[in-house]
């Protein structure tokens, strides 16, 4: 009798296991009309915030993205008041309805000389952050840069 009860319980458990599995994936499929490098291309103007040993300062400036190939974009960082003028290349991809890009090479091969990452939301707002070492007078200082701008 015990064996019969165990068999029935095992069959019921197995049956409930398959009943519990279902298609819960109701996520909409996003169809993009442009590739990531084409959709993200443009000039984004806004404010740079530079933080370092000498405090925090805010400057106006821009970042320009230009398509460089499949999933690649040329990035130009421009902030004359903070002596920032650098060019680099980054990987770029779709992220939900916006874009993300980054370059993790922190060497002189990367024109910025530091790794960086950024995000562009569906409204065209860009956020970028990185830390670099810059010479001010005779000393080298480490500064953290953050950019917030709009296309």
Annotated model-derived regions:
Residues 36-59, 149:
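Tryptophan-anchored aromatic micro-motifs
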Residues 54-94:
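N-terminal glycine/threonine-rich, aromatic-flanked beta-hairpin/loop signature
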Residues 1-8:
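Bacterial N-terminal signal peptides that target proteins for export
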Residues 3, 14-41:
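Bacterial Sec-dependent N-terminal signal peptides
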Residues 61-67, 90-92, 114-121, 146-149:
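Hydrophobic/aromatic beta-strand elements that line small-molecule binding cavities or substrate pockets
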């Amino acid at each position: 009798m015990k064996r019969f009860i165990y068999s029935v319980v095992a069959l019921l458990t197995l049956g409930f296991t398959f009943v519990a599995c279902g298609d819960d994936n109701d996520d909409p499929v996003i169809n993009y009309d442009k590739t990531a490098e084409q959709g993200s291309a443009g000039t984004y103007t806004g404010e740079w915030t530079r933080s370092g040993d000498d405090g925090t300062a805010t400057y106006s400036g821009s970042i320009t993205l230009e398509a460089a190939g499949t999933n690649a974009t040329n990035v130009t960082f421009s902030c004359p008041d903070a002596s920032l003028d650098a060019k680099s290349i980054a990987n770029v991809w779709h992220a939900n309805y916006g874009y993300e890009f980054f370059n993790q090479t922190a060497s002189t091969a990367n024109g910025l000389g530091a790794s960086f990452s950024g995000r562009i939301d569906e409204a065209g707002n860009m956020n970028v952050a990185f830390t670099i070492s810059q010479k001010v007078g005779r000393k080298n200082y480490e500064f953290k840069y953050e950019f917030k701008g709009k296309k």
